[in-house]
Amino acid sequence: MEFTGERFVPQCQGEIAAEHYHRYFFASGFVAGKRVLDIASGEGYGTHILAQSAAHVTGVDISPEAVANATQKYAGDRIAFLQGSAATIPLPDAAVDVVVSFETLEHLSEQEDMLGEIRRVLRQDGLLVISTPNKPLYSRQGDNFHVKELCREEFVALLKSRFAHVSLLGQKVMYGSLLSGTGGETLLLRQREEDGAVERMLFTEQARYFIALAGNGPLPPTQSSFFDYPLEKSDLTAQLRENLAELQERHDAAQARLEAVEAAYTAILASRSWLATAPLRRLRHLLKGKGNKS
């Protein structure tokens, strides 16, 4: 599958890759030995990650092309793909232990229907792991595929309308140093460029995405995690490489023009006409010198 901006594909690199892989690696910690549903499974890479430890994973996507691609690439004894909508999931009641739904909610206007369907296919003590962009921060980027983005309060309220317990985490790609504690909310420290002062704020207030665990039974404990994504694959590095390549092209073009001028000049110096007119140029030089003395 090719990247269109609607569904992530594994050949993508940069921040988008770090975000998507981190979410699925995080979710894989809750699916060991479980029956799992991956809503909006897309290319299938995430469903495949979950299937490494789950008893069985069903990926559901509305796109026939995505389902066909994922089936051909990933299907096996513990993984299957079905075509269907998040608002009308093609599974029976209480069919799965865990539902994973990453970056799907904001693509639908029928968000209450989606949560109702997730609740229907989950077992009574089942777990939902779901993510969505943080509207106040993400909307600045613009996304033509998003129908209804949510702020923190709206996201939590929607989940609590269907589930008794909700636990919220934040996600944001950063390059820096991580100090991880054993409890409490993560504190984000940022030094202001204008005066060097240090700003202190809760990480979830600055997160670009929210990831929530929801269920009607006790929720499993969560730990902060850091996905060590190579800096050389970051968006910044890619932009610097692009700028460097452009500068190299300009340098090569300028060098080629200089060499062409030098070659033309050398050709002129070696030409018969240049050699034949050499006495005239010397005479003109002498006459010019005498004129200056007078």
Where are these regions (language model features)?
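Conserved N-terminal segment of class I S-adenosyl-L-methionine
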Residues: 1-94, 98-102, 112-115, 142, ...
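Class I S-adenosylmethionine-dependent transferase superfamily signal
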Residues: 50, 118, 159
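A short His-aromatic
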Residues: 103-107
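A short glycine-rich, Lys/Arg-flanked "PGG" loop and its adjoining helix->strand segment in the class I
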Residues: 112-124
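Conserved beta-strand signature within the Rossmann-like core of class I S-adenosyl-L-methionine
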Residues: 125-132
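Short "lid" loop at the C-terminus of a central beta-strand within the Rossmann-like core
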Residues: 133-138, 172-176
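Acceptor-substrate binding/catalytic loop of class I
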Residues: 139-157
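Conserved S-adenosyl-L-methionine
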Residues: 163-175, 193-199
